[in-house]
Amino acid sequence: MRIVFMGTPEFAVPSLRSIAAEHNHFELVLVVTGSDKPRRGRNAPSEPSPVKSAALELGFQVYETDDVSSSDFLSVVADSAPDVIVVAAFRILPPEVYGQAKLGAFNLHASLLPAYRGAAPINWAIINGEKESGVTTFFLQKTVDTGNVIMQEKIPVLPDDNASILSVKLSHLGAELVVKTLRSIQAGTVEVQAQDDAFFSRAPKLTRENTRIRWNQPVAVLSDFIRGLAMKPAAWTTVQNRTMKIFRAIPFTEEITSSIEQPGSILVERGRFLVRGSDGWLEVKQLQPEGRKPMEGAEFARGFRPESGTSLLFE
């Protein structure tokens, strides 16, 4: 069975490696990925995608593109004569591309569809306090993330999982599911299920605006928001007119004598860096001030001497 694989970030690499390991059953004829990205520095070489690096290491032919609608790309896919196209964290493909696969084209999505359709399912699942997540394979169709579900696998979202940790877990779970899906397609035993839109939810693209911390929320909500964006792109706020990224923060449960109730207020208490939410205090455990390296909250607290009631800026 001839396979074309399409993916770009680290999330897609385990799936690529799992397909490659099944070389006695599947023929991986082409790997498609995004173009190399320029690095900072005058003469710095461009940076290949994680999928490109892995594919070259494994000895596969790689085609780079940022334009999946071009006639050149369509010709490359058609010339590969794929039985199946596997997509993992790539671009939205036009029907002219995925229609080239004789047995179908499917996508690996990092949620339990129809929940969290969109660009950032891992982040929004944690932000919304979900206790369970998973991966889905589904056949591509014109409307994004709405195709018939082939297979799903679930895992719990643990209290200490952030977006980076959960992404690694789901990438490996997804790699197993991709191989199971390919075996089912090859055997002709695929059974699909239409998505029930009654359970639909969105996972929109992360932006500068929707990753800003709004401190006038309960501390449990704030904690989930912060871990849902860690380590990249990271939740952010401003303090003394400078941006600060916050990677980890937990509800502070010890007794505090302070009478401060204004959300966003800072308190350095017993060497800890605390910020007021709407219903209590949040201890900032890991952060990165603008222009500095990431550090522990306690380290920042030792050198930070705000006036009583100094507030982080928030809207």
From Swiss-Prot:
Annotated function: Attaches a formyl group to the free amino group of methionyl-tRNA(fMet). The formyl group appears to play a dual role in the initiator identity of N-formylmethionyl-tRNA by promoting its recognition by IF2 and preventing the misappropriation of this tRNA by the elongation apparatus.
InterPro entries cross-referenced by the UniProt entry: Fmt, Formyl_trans_C, Formyl_transf_N, Formyl_transf_N_sf, Formyl_transferase-like_C_sf, Met-tRNA-FMT_C, Met-tRNA-FMT_N
Protein name, per record: Methionyl-tRNA formyltransferase
GO molecular function, one term: methionyl-tRNA formyltransferase activity
E.C. number: 2.1.2.9
Keywords attached to this entry: Protein biosynthesis, Transferase
Catalytic activity reported: L-methionyl-tRNA(fMet) + (6R)-10-formyltetrahydrofolate = N-formyl-L-methionyl-tRNA(fMet) + (6S)-5,6,7,8-tetrahydrofolate + H(+)
Extent of the signal sequence: none
Binding of (6S)-5,6,7,8-tetrahydrofolate, residues: 111-114
Family stated for the protein in its record: Belongs to the Fmt family.
Domain of life: Bacteria
Broadest EC class assigned to this enzyme: transferase
A cellular component term, taken from the record's GO annotations: cytosol
Pfam families assigned: Formyl_trans_C, Formyl_trans_N
